[in-house]
Amino acid sequence: TGRKWKQVARQKETVRYVVCNGDEGDPGAFMDGSVMEGDPFKLIEGMMIAAYAVRAENGYIYVRAEYPMSVARLRNAIAQLEERGLLGDNILGSDFSFHMHINRGAGAFVCGEGSALTASIEGSRGMPRTKPPRTVEKGLWEKPTVLNNVETYANVPKIICLLYTSPSPRDGAT
């Protein structure tokens, strides 16, 4: 994940995107839905951190069609954050702006693949593209794109917290 983010941040193109794959097409898999419904703020916070790291102004959550409750909870969380000035333009008076968008999947298993997912968000048929280029170079709308799944984004805030609260080797800890 860190390598992907670093690759996107280093691209010359200034327009960049952060995308979350919440399609979870595997039969019987419900982890993404449980995170999006149980704590959508955790997912959004992780995406905001990614956006800040790569200087992206727009993020997209691609949610499988069978998760209407996830969409409702995400929309509610986004609205609350926008009302409080934590999402949108000039967050907390800073020069950081980040807008969140939700796209509903069409139920195609293939859209779990990165290039098929970005094609679907763009309004095209969700078909995989040949690689290279990878999404970090030319993803959504042919722009550098960070693409991670729900679990990855949801764990980013916790990882950062652990890094800043754990003793470091410089403190004599191992």
For the regions a protein language model found, what residue spans apply to each?
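N-terminal glycine-rich phosphate/pyrophosphate-binding loops that anchor nucleotide-derived ligands
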Residues: T1-R16
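Conserved phosphate/anionic-ligand binding catalytic regions in large, soluble enzymes, centered on
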Residues: T1-W5, G107-T118
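Gly-rich Lys/Arg/Thr-decorated short loops/hinges at beta-loop-alpha junctions or inter-strand turns
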Residues: C20-D32
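Histidine-anchored nucleotide/phosphate-binding helix
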Residues: P40-Y52
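Conserved short loop/turn motifs at secondary-structure junctions
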Residues: N58-V71, R75, A106
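A glycine-rich helix N-cap at a beta->alpha junction
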Residues: R73-G107
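Polar, glycine-rich mid-to-C-terminal structural blocks
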Residues: L117-T152
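Conserved small/polar residues in nucleotide/adenosyl-binding loops
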Residues: Y164-P169
